[in-house]
Regions:
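Acidic, Ser/Pro/Thr-rich low-complexity regulatory regions
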Residues: 2-259
Length: 259
C-alpha cells in the first residue's frame, strides 16, 4: 500500500512536526525503554490521515514486541524520509518530557525524578542541574528554602513545568562557563559570579557582587527568572550581551563553611 499524504499534499510545517514527534517518541523508547511510544507514533500518523502498510502494522503491534516495533518503526521513518534518529537524542527526550508534562500526561514531580536520573544515565552535563534542583526540592520537603530557587510547595509543579520548557530553550545555547553559578546583580544589572563573604564571627555567609561590590539581591541563572532574563537579553537586538558578563572565580559555599 503506498503512503497516502492528504491526497499527496503535505505542508513542510506538517512534515517538520511529524519528524519532531518521531524523534521525541523514539528518544523515550531508546532511553527509557518506552517502546510503546513508537506504536503511539503510528497511531498519531493514522489520526493525521497518513497511511501505509507499515504504519498499520506498527500501530497494531503489542507494546512488548520490541523486535517488530523496531523493524516497522524504522520502515515507517524511512518512508517519511526521517533520518538521524539518534542525533540530539538527549535534547529530543527533554522535548518529549516537556510535551508530556505540558499536556498533563505525566506529573511534574515524576518528570523531575526522570531528569535527575538522566545525568547518571547519559553523563550529559546539561542534566546535572536537575540533580541539584532535586536536592533543593528535598530540602523544601523538610521546610528549608534553598536560596537559588524561587520555589515553595504551592508553586513547585508549575515551576518544574516552566523549568523544563526553559531548559529546552537553553539546551543548544552556548552558555558561559559556570552559567548555573551566575546571577544578575539587582544593583548594577550585570551578569556575575557572586563572591561569597563571611560575617565577622564566620557564622553566616552572604553574597557580594564582584562588579559593583554591592551586597544586594541576585537573580540566579539556575532559577527560572534568571533563565528568562538571560534569554531575553541574549535575544535582544539592542543588548551588547557579552559585554554585560563579569566572570570571576567563585569559592564554593561548602568549602567556605568548612573553614
Amino acid at each position: 500500500m503506498p503512503l497516502v499524504w492528504y491526497e499527496g499534499k503535505v505542508l513542510k510545517l506538517e512534515l517538520k512536526e511529524i519528524e519532531k514527534i518521531a524523534k521525541e517518541n523514539y528518544s523515550a523508547a531508546k532511553l527509557q525503554n518506552k517502546w510503546y511510544e513508537c506504536v503511539n507514533f503510528a497511531l498519531y500518523l493514522l489520526d493525521e490521515k497518513i497511511e501505509s502498510e507499515n504504519i498499520y502494522i506498527l500501530a497494531g503491534l503489542d507494546s512488548d514486541d520490541y523486535d517488530n516495533i523496531n523493524k516497522y518503526f524504522f520502515a515507517v521513518t524511512n518512508e517519511l524520509k526521517i533520518v538521524k534518529m539518534d542525533e540530539d537524542i538527549n535534547y529530543n527526550f527533554l522535548c518529549y518530557l516537556g510535551r508530556k508534562v505540558h499536556n498533563d500526561e505525566i506529573e511534574a514531580i515524576y518528570a523531575l525524578t526522570i531528569l535527575e536520573k538522566m545525568y547518571y544515565q547519559t553523563n550529559d552535563k546539561r542534566f546535572w542541574e536537575w540533580v541539584e534542583f532535586g536536592n533543593a526540592v528535598d530540602l523544601l520537603e523538610d521546610g528549608i528554602t534553598y536560596y537559588e530557587y524561587d520555589i515553595n510547595k504551592d508553586n513547585l509543579c508549575d515551576y518544574i513545568k516552566e523549568k523544563i520548557l526553559l531548559d529546552i530553550d537553553l539546551y543548544k545555547e552556548q552558555l558561559p562557563d559556570n552559567f548555573f553559578k551566575m546571577a544578575f546583580c539587582e544593583k548594577c544589572k550585570k551578569l556575575v559570579i557572586p563572591e561569597i563573604k563571611k560575617t565577622l564571627f564566620r557564622k553566616k555567609f552572604f553574597y557580594k557582587c564582584n562588579n559593583c561590590k554591592a551586597t544586594s539581591k541576585f537573580l540566579w541563572c539556575s532559577d527560572n527568572k534568571g533563565k528568562k532574563l538571560y534569554l531575553e537579553r541574549k535575544n535582544s537586538p539592542n543588548t551588547r550581551f557579552n559585554a554585560d558578563i563579569v566572570d570571576k572565580p567563585q569559592i564554593q559555599v561548602r568549602r567556605m563553611l568548612d573553614k
